Amino acid sequence: MGILLGILAATVWGIAGVAGGLAARLVGPTRAIAWAMMLGMVVAVPLALASGAPGRIDVRTGLWILLISACMLAGLVCVYAGMRYGSISVVAPISATYGGVAALIAIVAGDPVTGLAIGALSLAVVGAVLAARGETATPGAAYSNQRVAAVLGAGAAVVWGVQLWAGGQIQDDLGASWLVASARMIGVLVIALPLLLRGGLRVERRALPYLLVAGVGEVCGFTLYLFDTEYGIAQAAVLTGQYGTVAALIGIFILKERLQFTQIIGLVLIVIAVIGLALA
C-alpha cells in the first residue's frame, strides 16, 4: 500500500506541475500561481480543519511560516517561468533536486553527512548541467531560452530546499496539514488578493482546467505523501521525489518534447541523484 501511495503522490504532483506550467504559458506565472493558491486553499483548509486544531502558534512559528510561504511562492515562480522559457521535461526534474539543497543546509547546520549524500549531490549537479545543454524541440512550440529555463529550475530547487528544511523545523509543532494550508492562505493574501483588487485575475477559459489541476493536485499530492510516510519516510521520499520524472515523461511522450542525447543522460543522472538523496 505504501508503494502505491508513493507512486500516486508522485503522479499527482507531476501532473499538477505540468498543468501549472501549461497554465503559465497561457496566462503568465503570476496569475497562474494566484489561481493555484486560491484553488489549493479550497482543498487545503478543509483538510487542515479535519486534522484537528493546529499545534503551537507563536512568533517563532509565525516567522517560520512566512519563510516557508515565501520559498514556496518563489519556487513556483521559478518553475512556471522556467516552463515558459523552456521545456517541462528539463525544468521539472532539475527542480526536483531540492532534497539536495535541504541536505546541504542540514550539513551546514551541523547534521552528520554520509558519503551517499555527497555522491548524490555531485550527481545532481552533473545531471543538471547536462540537462541544460542544447535546445529542446517540440512540434508547434518555440522556446525562447532553454538555459534560462534550466537556471530557473535550479532556482526552484534552491528555494524549495530551504522550504523543506524550514518545514522540518516546525512541522511537529504546527502540523503538516496546517503548514500546507497556512502557506496557501498567505499566497492568496500576497499574490491573489492584490491581483483581484486590480482586476488582474481574469484568465482565458481554456486555462481554467490547467489551473484547477495545478492548484488542487499540489495539495492532493502532499496529502498522499503524508499518508505514505506512515509506511516509512525513506520509501515515501524516494517515490514522491520522482514527480520530476513523471513530469518529464509527460513532456516527452504526451507533449512530444524532443531532447538531445546529453539532456536525456542528464535527466537519468538526476533521477538517480534524487533516489540517492532520499536514501541518504
Where are these regions (language model features)?
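Hydrophobic transmembrane alpha-helices of multi-pass small-molecule transport proteins
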Residues: 101-106, 116-135, 263-279
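Hydrophobic alpha-helical transmembrane segments in multi-pass integral membrane proteins
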Residues: 44-54, 102-117, 158-174, 218-236, ...
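Juxtamembrane helix-loop-helix junctions in multi-pass membrane proteins
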Residues: 11-39, 53-54, 159-186, 235-238
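Interfacial loop-to-transmembrane junctions
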Residues: 249-271
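Hydrophobic/small/kink-forming positions within alpha-helical transmembrane segments
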Residues: 11-14, 18, 45, 69-77, ...
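Membrane-interface interhelical linkers
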Residues: 1-10, 19-20, 25-30, 34-65, ...
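Specific alpha-helical transmembrane segments that line the substrate/conduction pathway
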Residues: 9, 65-73, 80-128, 178-186, ...
